[in-house]
Amino acid sequence: MGVCGYLFLPWKCLVVVSLRLLFLVPTGVPVRSGDATFPKAMDNVTVRQGESATLRCTIDNRVTRVAWLNRSTILYAGNDKWCLDPRVVLLSNTQTQYSIEIQNVDVYDEGPYTCSVQTDNHPKTSRVHLIVQVSPKIVEISSDISINEGNNISLTCIATGRPEPTVTWRHISPKAVGFVSEDEYLEIQGITREQSGEYECSASNDVAAPVVRRVNVTVNYPPYISEAKGTGVPVGQKGTLQCEASAVPSAEFQWFKDDKRLVEGKKGVKVENRPFLSRLTFFNVSEHDYGNYTCVASNKLGHTNASIMLFGPGAVSEVNNGTSRRAGCIWLLPLLVLHLLLKF
């Protein structure tokens, strides 16, 4: 649809037959194009949506009548406007140039425009094609998603523009891994926790700056205890047991000793829970406090636990991830092996 396609006067916006009646193209005379040095319109005109397009036609003093047409619709004939569209204005009508301007160009203005002239001999025409470029726009994109580890996901990013924009997906957090897809659709099979974070969709077509939208992907997984730290503390001193767990959603922590849960508020003991960390603090350690404690981390997807020792000085030499060994066993074992070798 051209510039007059949506608003016209029935008695003015005429087809080419009407133009023949104006003697620009006399009935029965074939229209010639490109067989003379005039009229000479511009080459293809490319403008961005919303800008103004100027259509120029070079003529000379042999021209008696001149007009601009959009397909079969007359826009201007000489100084007379034949189209009601207020965006179409006459810029110049001289012996050497006949120019019009289309303001605030839109995509429906795209198409062929013809400069038609009448001389003493015969009519001539010259054609120019108006190309309208449109900045990229993302019209549809997936919402933020929460999914369990191991499942499949599909992200969608639909963009429009002229020329058709190129769509790319990029994983930008927590670790930038570069482009992951050059397509409107991003498929991830068996997603892992490392693939969580923000995914950026970019649409570009060199008409304007790329447009960017982001989707946040949350990958849920059961707790994993990454550190279970015991400690050796003399009687009467302050001691802390620490348990760290990675999980999404964040883990909830509980502490047990001899199958009994330790609760906040017990005299001399404090339980401090954070999203990925729990501390069990003894402000005045007694002999009764020594022993094995169990840290339990859980969320809706599962749970895990680790054993941690609170011990006196010299009682335990190594505590890590819920394992402990008596210090005496560490140095007695080499002596026992040496004794057996000497005996035999």
From Swiss-Prot:
It comes from the Eukaryota. GO terms for molecular function: identical protein binding. Its main location: membrane. It is a lipid-anchor; GPI-anchor. Glycans are attached at residues 44, 70, 152, 216, 284, 292, 305, 321. GO terms for cellular component: axon; cell surface; excitatory synapse; extracellular space; hippocampal mossy fiber to CA3 synapse; perinuclear region of cytoplasm; postsynaptic density membrane; presynaptic active zone membrane. It holds the Pfam family I-set. Residues 1-32 form the signal peptide. Residues 322-344 form a propeptide. Disulfide bonds join 57-115, 157-201, 243-295. Keywords: Cell adhesion, Cell membrane, Disulfide bond, Glycoprotein, GPI-anchor, Immunoglobulin domain, Lipoprotein, Membrane, Repeat, Signal. Residues 39-126, 136-218, 222-309 form the Ig-like C2-type domain. A lipid is attached at residue 321 (GPI-anchor amidated asparagine). It is found in: Cell membrane. GO terms for biological process: cell adhesion; cellular response to estradiol stimulus; cerebellum development; negative regulation of glial cell proliferation; negative regulation of neuron projection development; positive regulation of neuron projection development; positive regulation of Schwann cell migration; response to estradiol. Central nervous system. Neural cell adhesion molecule. Belongs to the immunoglobulin superfamily. IgLON family. This is Neurotrimin. It comes from Rattus norvegicus.
